[in-house]
Amino acid sequence: MKLCLRCSILVISTLLFVVPGIVSASWQPEITVGICQGVAEAEFSGRNAPLYVYTDEQQKSPLLTIPQQEKLRVRFLHNTFELNGKTYEAKQLYIQAGEYESIYINDMPYRGYITLLKQNGMTVINHVLTEDYLYGVVPKEMPSTWPMGALRAQSIAARTFALKNRNRHNEQGFDLCNTAHCQVYEGSSAETKETTVAVDRTRGEVMFYHGAIIDAVFHTDSGGMTESAEQVWGSYVPYLRAVSELQTKTKPWTQRVSTALFVKKMEESGKKIGRMKSIHLSPLSIGKGSKDRSPSGRVQFIEVLGDKGNCVVSGSDLRRLFALPSTLFDVQRESSDIVFRGYGRGHGLGLSQWGAKAFADRGKTDREILSHYYTDITIEKIY
């Protein structure tokens, strides 16, 4: 068997430090995406072509051929694969349709081909070329109705993030997962005309800082000002600096938590305060720091006073404990509740998607948008 994507793979180190312009225009890297992990069964089909199942990438004849429109039901039983009721001994399986044909996984179409691994159950992995991968990512990360400048900026950011973070899930046997932990990916069922055009018009374009591909993290909405990396990750990153938006205090949100639940969460975190007496936090002013806020205004910590003790809780811990949209908030006690009122959604690093839309609405190009959010970067076409 000759899998059609294999000719596109280069060693990962070549992606992290690239001299633009020397890579063949026909080359592009392959991404492996974890679609399902630890499952007991899955279903596959080829709507317009047969499916071919192999036990080895170099195998010339398939182990099994599934006619088009018919289902391949794979079950993982007692550390073996059962294919349509028959057991096969194999370390892993490869499933391929005809070239340029999609494979349906549980009735959802995916480009490329599939690997099945034994790993605490069965892991389903989609092998897909970078540009095909982006066709299924960009429409899930940004609405296709948004301006082309924003869609193009998102395409470049998503491509850069994917290439920088290949092998993020190496221990699980693939590069990236299909959730917001990496990038949301739903295969070809997600594709739209507008986002495909945005990907195609930026083909191979990647962001660099001093010759190295950047970690192009992005988020939904900064609330008025993005954040610097050291305030979130604890380490300085030269291209991830706090920058202002065209608009402040966008998309306000409110979240209420009962005082009883708040105290319970504190105790579960090892902070014994007893009956709550008060909460101390400087008032929010976007773009203005204080002893308990970063220079962008995000909460670094709050002080909680109780009749049995006091404690300090970080903004990131509060966001995690109470599923807050961001750390750009005020907090007050109201009757028997603790009320968080804030702005923005996400960690605040890098590209703000709503901010990108605002810039694109005013006619800014993808490069102008990206240069605003990622300091001193260059954008190069590597294939």
Language-model segments: residues:
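Conserved, single-site charged/polar hotspot
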Residues: K2-Y383
